[in-house]
């Protein structure tokens, strides 16, 4: 499966099965950072990564994404945030919550920064297959050398909607194998075999489902974006990937208060942007990985609420 999308061979010795992508992230952070050390995190970002750093006693240093004609990563801002305590860069692309895809150039420059400063990279590319309009998400696999210090996180939860199975994997340099195997052994002792068999079936036979899933998400994205754009009050960049719309609504700067009002008064659930760190406040994250008819109803409810 790894060789097919990226067109290059992979060794099984570089892969470690984990209890979901979250355990892969937790193991990766334990490998690299300790108390008092720092990790650079482009934000808005999924908050669980910050939590994993805090468990290790490390500190997340937010580096805000630029918001011009699209969400984008400024490598100069990233490098400016490096200090003697910095140990790693975490990059989630395609990204939750913004749906932004880092360009090949942004990825290559991030890798160059890591090389110059001796940093590790944790590459969370779990939404890499869920892209729209014929776009391919660039990967660190496209630009890395065999000796680069990169840990890749993956999960079955997104592509194949297997969230409840709690299965993912960590791809790492093989010299880390003994340490990673011990961390798995001392925490969960491994992933249940029947879950691994389900994951194998998804990887070997799940392309048709993934194609259907992406097309359904694309239709839902278009319905949501078109419905909210017609209100004239909702501001957003159309997501290039993943299945989230990160938007702001004129007149509502407090995202938590807005999210509570939406669920109470319009019957639409949304995540407040403040939960995703610097750059998130004033936004909402709407998930459109649902049936298009449900998304159309959500857009209608929001439009009626805004009009009222």
State where each predicted segment sits.
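PLP-dependent class I/II
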Residues: 1-308
């Amino acid at each position: 499966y790894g060789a097919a999308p990226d067109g290059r061979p992979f060794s099984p010795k570089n892969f470690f099965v984990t209890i979901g992508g979250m355990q892969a992230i937790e193991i990766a952070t334990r490998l690299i950072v300790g108390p008092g050390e720092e990790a650079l995190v482009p934000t808005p970002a999924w908050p669980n990564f910050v939590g994993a750093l805090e468990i290790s006693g490390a500190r997340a240093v937010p580096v805000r994404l630029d918001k011009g004609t699209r969400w984008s990563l400024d490598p100069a801002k990233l490098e400016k945030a490096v200090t003697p305590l910095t140990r790693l860069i975490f990059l989630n692309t395609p990204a939750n919550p913004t749906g932004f895809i880092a360009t090949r150039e942004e990825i290559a420059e991030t890798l160059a920064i890591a090389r110059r400063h001796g940093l590790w990279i944790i590459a969370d590319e779990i939404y890499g297959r869920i892209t729209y309009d014929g776009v391919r998400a660039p990967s660190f696999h496209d630009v890395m050398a065999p000796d680069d210090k990169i840990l890749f996180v993956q999960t079955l939860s997104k592509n194949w909607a297997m969230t409840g199975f709690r299965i993912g994997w960590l791809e790492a340099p093989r010299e880390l194998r003994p340490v990673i195997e011990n961390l798995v052994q001392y925490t969960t002792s491994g992933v249940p075999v029947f879950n691994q068999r389900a994951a194998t079936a998804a990887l070997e036979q799940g392309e048709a489902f993934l194609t259907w899933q992406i097309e359904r998400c694309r239709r839902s994205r278009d319905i949501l974006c078109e419905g909210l754009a017609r209100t004239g009050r909702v501001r957003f960049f159309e997501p290039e990937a993943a299945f989230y719309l990160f938007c702001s609504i004129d007149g509502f700067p407090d995202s938590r208060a807005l999210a509570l009002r939406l669920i109470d008064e319009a019957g639409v659930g949304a995540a407040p942007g403040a939960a995703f760190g610097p750059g998130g406040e004033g936004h909402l994250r709407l998930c459109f990985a649902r049936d298009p008819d449900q998304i159309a109803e959500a857009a209608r409810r929001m439009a009626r609420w805004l009009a009222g």
